[in-house]
Protein backbone atom coordinates (compact mmCIF):
# COMPACT_ATOMS: atom_id res chain seq x y z
CA UNK A 1 0.00 0.00 0.00
CA UNK A 2 2.90 2.32 0.80
CA UNK A 3 4.44 1.71 -2.62
CA UNK A 4 1.17 2.65 -4.33
CA UNK A 5 0.96 5.85 -2.29
CA UNK A 6 4.53 6.79 -3.29
CA UNK A 7 3.76 6.16 -6.95
CA UNK A 8 0.67 8.37 -6.77
CA UNK A 9 2.70 11.15 -5.14
CA UNK A 10 5.33 10.96 -7.90
CA UNK A 11 2.78 11.05 -10.73
CA UNK A 12 2.35 14.87 -10.94
CA UNK A 13 6.11 15.39 -11.03
CA UNK A 14 6.48 12.74 -13.71
CA UNK A 15 3.73 14.35 -15.81
CA UNK A 16 5.40 17.75 -15.50
CA UNK A 17 8.78 16.32 -16.55
CA UNK A 18 7.26 14.58 -19.57
CA UNK A 19 5.46 17.76 -20.59
CA UNK A 20 8.58 19.91 -20.27
CA UNK A 21 10.68 17.40 -22.22
CA UNK A 22 8.06 17.26 -24.96
CA UNK A 23 8.03 21.07 -25.20
CA UNK A 24 11.82 21.15 -25.40
CA UNK A 25 11.81 18.48 -28.11
CA UNK A 26 9.22 20.38 -30.13
CA UNK A 27 11.16 23.63 -29.85
CA UNK A 28 14.48 22.00 -30.77
CA UNK A 29 13.09 20.27 -33.82
CA UNK A 30 11.75 23.60 -35.09
CA UNK A 31 15.12 25.28 -34.47
CA UNK A 32 17.10 22.67 -36.44
CA UNK A 33 14.88 22.62 -39.53
CA UNK A 34 16.93 25.28 -41.36
CA UNK A 35 20.42 24.01 -40.47
CA UNK A 36 22.61 22.62 -43.26
CA UNK A 37 23.61 18.96 -43.34
CA UNK A 38 27.02 18.04 -41.89
CA UNK A 39 30.05 17.66 -44.19
CA UNK A 40 30.53 14.23 -45.85
CA UNK A 41 33.53 13.28 -43.66
CA UNK A 42 31.35 13.55 -40.54
CA UNK A 43 28.68 11.33 -42.04
CA UNK A 44 31.09 8.41 -42.25
CA UNK A 45 31.77 8.00 -38.50
CA UNK A 46 29.94 5.20 -36.71
CA UNK A 47 28.39 7.47 -34.13
CA UNK A 48 26.95 9.73 -36.81
CA UNK A 49 25.55 6.67 -38.59
CA UNK A 50 23.85 5.59 -35.36
CA UNK A 51 22.51 9.09 -34.81
CA UNK A 52 21.17 9.36 -38.33
CA UNK A 53 19.55 5.92 -38.15
CA UNK A 54 17.89 6.75 -34.82
CA UNK A 55 16.69 10.04 -36.28
CA UNK A 56 15.21 8.19 -39.27
CA UNK A 57 13.38 5.80 -36.95
CA UNK A 58 12.15 8.31 -34.38
CA UNK A 59 11.39 11.41 -36.44
CA UNK A 60 8.11 10.09 -37.94
CA UNK A 61 6.88 9.03 -34.49
CA UNK A 62 7.79 12.40 -32.99
CA UNK A 63 6.08 14.23 -35.85
CA UNK A 64 2.90 12.15 -35.52
CA UNK A 65 2.85 12.66 -31.76
CA UNK A 66 3.39 16.41 -32.13
CA UNK A 67 0.55 16.63 -34.65
CA UNK A 68 -1.83 14.63 -32.46
CA UNK A 69 -1.05 16.64 -29.35
CA UNK A 70 -1.04 20.06 -31.02
CA UNK A 71 -3.88 21.23 -28.76
CA UNK A 72 -1.59 20.73 -25.78
CA UNK A 73 1.04 23.13 -27.08
CA UNK A 74 -1.31 26.10 -27.08
CA UNK A 75 -0.22 28.72 -24.60
CA UNK A 76 -3.51 28.91 -22.69
CA UNK A 77 -3.61 25.14 -22.10
CA UNK A 78 -0.02 25.02 -20.90
CA UNK A 79 -0.51 28.11 -18.73
CA UNK A 80 -3.61 26.55 -17.18
CA UNK A 81 -1.76 23.33 -16.47
CA UNK A 82 1.15 25.17 -14.86
CA UNK A 83 -1.21 27.31 -12.74
CA UNK A 84 -3.07 24.23 -11.53
CA UNK A 85 0.21 22.44 -10.78
CA UNK A 86 1.46 25.47 -8.85
CA UNK A 87 -1.78 25.77 -6.87
CA UNK A 88 -1.81 22.07 -6.01
CA UNK A 89 1.87 21.45 -5.25
CA UNK A 90 4.05 24.55 -5.03
CA UNK A 91 2.00 27.34 -3.43
CA UNK A 92 3.00 26.51 0.14
CA UNK A 93 6.50 25.28 -0.74
CA UNK A 94 8.22 28.22 1.00
CA UNK A 95 6.61 27.69 4.43
CA UNK A 96 7.02 23.91 4.13
CA UNK A 97 10.71 24.31 3.28
CA UNK A 98 11.27 26.74 6.15
CA UNK A 99 9.58 24.35 8.61
CA UNK A 100 11.63 21.42 7.32
CA UNK A 101 14.88 23.39 7.61
CA UNK A 102 14.11 24.44 11.19
CA UNK A 103 13.20 20.87 12.17
CA UNK A 104 16.36 19.56 10.51
CA UNK A 105 18.49 22.16 12.30
CA UNK A 106 16.94 21.28 15.67
CA UNK A 107 17.42 17.58 15.02
CA UNK A 108 21.04 18.08 13.98
CA UNK A 109 21.77 20.21 17.06
CA UNK A 110 20.21 17.59 19.34
CA UNK A 111 22.32 14.86 17.76
CA UNK A 112 25.45 17.00 18.06
CA UNK A 113 24.80 17.72 21.74
CA UNK A 114 24.18 14.05 22.43
CA UNK A 115 27.60 13.19 20.94
CA UNK A 116 29.46 16.01 22.68
CA UNK A 117 31.15 15.30 26.05
CA UNK A 118 29.46 17.01 29.00
CA UNK A 119 32.57 18.97 29.94
CA UNK A 120 32.71 20.71 26.54
CA UNK A 121 29.01 21.20 25.80
CA UNK A 122 27.53 21.70 29.26
CA UNK A 123 25.31 24.78 29.56
CA UNK A 124 26.80 27.38 31.90
CA UNK A 125 24.40 29.05 34.33
From Swiss-Prot:
Residues 1-27 form the signal peptide. May participate in lipoprotein metabolism. GO terms for cellular component: high-density lipoprotein particle; very-low-density lipoprotein particle. The keyword Transport applies. It comes from the Eukaryota. Transmembrane segments: none annotated. GO terms for biological process: lipid transport; positive regulation of triglyceride storage; triglyceride homeostasis. The keyword DNA damage does not apply. Keywords: Lipid transport, Secreted, Signal, Transport. It is found in: Secreted. It comes from Plecturocebus moloch (Dusky titi monkey). This is Apolipoprotein C-IV. Pfam families: APOC4 (PF15119). Belongs to the apolipoprotein C4 family.
Amino acid sequence: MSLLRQRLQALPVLCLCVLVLACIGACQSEAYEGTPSPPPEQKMSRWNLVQSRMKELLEPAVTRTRDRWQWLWSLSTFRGFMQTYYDDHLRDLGPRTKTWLLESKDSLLNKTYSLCPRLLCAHKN
